[in-house]
Amino acid sequence: MKIEAVVFDWAGTTVDYGCFAPLEVFMKIFHKRGVEITAEEARKPMGLLKIDHIRVLTEMPRISNEWKHVFGQLPTEEDIHEMYEEFEEILFAILPYYATPIDGVKEVVSSLRERGIKIGSTTGYTREMMDIVAKEAEIQGYKPDFLVTPNDVPAGRPYPWMCYKNAMELCVYPMNHMIKIGDTVSDMKEGRNAGMWTVGVILGSSELGLTEEEVENMDPLELREKIEVVRNRFIENGAHFTIETMQELENVIEHIEKQELIIS
């Protein structure tokens, strides 16, 4: 078994430690309408196409009930599109500041390329958003061989289409010769649905939701508990492997190749 390509997620996996760029924007657009949502609620759908993310938030029972209390009715598609337009406007302005590669990513990608492994990527951001993020990340030294956004395929995560398009453009087949790595539940489902080896990265992830400073200063036992919660969540949603940092990815690749594992 030879791993020929790795498909990385972006925010929370390769850039934007903790995936904070969209978080406060989601909270802000609801707050503006008198509906308060928590950071935990805002993170739950992370990884989806952003308009789908907003739609899922409006469908959460507590949020939909609070919306109904404020407006006397449940959110409509018009409300969702209106919030999405505001979301885009705010996010576009801040995205350049959230495109810094996470520590270790550039070195791991360079090492993978030395092994002949191709580098693909998928995202929950739109093409317009990624034009900003990818440009800034490239300036800072990170550029995958290929990028697919939900705009390029019939549907985003958890559907496998973005991974399939990466496979076609990178000329890799069968799908079990590829790894999908990400930091959200939707990443795990995307990779599994595509028939790929699926890896969840924990530190820096949206699922963990901590800044680098918080990780460094947290009580080790408390941090370990939080890490294990995320690890279990990834496994429950299809991850074949979990890693705490990107530097562990090559160990996973060697394990798959040496053990000649078969996707179950």
UniProtKB/Swiss-Prot annotation:
Any single Gene Ontology cellular-component annotation: cytosol
UniProt entry tagged with the keyword Protease: no
Keywords: Hydrolase, Magnesium, Metal-binding, Schiff base
Molecular-function annotations in GO: magnesium ion binding; phosphoglycolate phosphatase activity; phosphonoacetaldehyde hydrolase activity
Top-level enzyme category: hydrolase
Cofactor info, note text: Binds 1 Mg(2+) ion per subunit.
Example GO biological process: organic phosphonate catabolic process
Source domain of life: Bacteria
Swiss-Prot/TrEMBL catalytic activity: phosphonoacetaldehyde + H2O = acetaldehyde + phosphate + H(+)
Cofactor(s) recorded in Swiss-Prot or TrEMBL: Mg(2+)
Function: Involved in phosphonate degradation.
Family recorded in the similarity comment: Belongs to the HAD-like hydrolase superfamily. PhnX family.
NCBIfam families on file: HAD-SF-IA-v1 (TIGR01549), phosphonatase (TIGR01422)
Subunit structure: Homodimer.
Protein name: Phosphonoacetaldehyde hydrolase
Native source species: Bacillus mycoides (strain KBAB4)
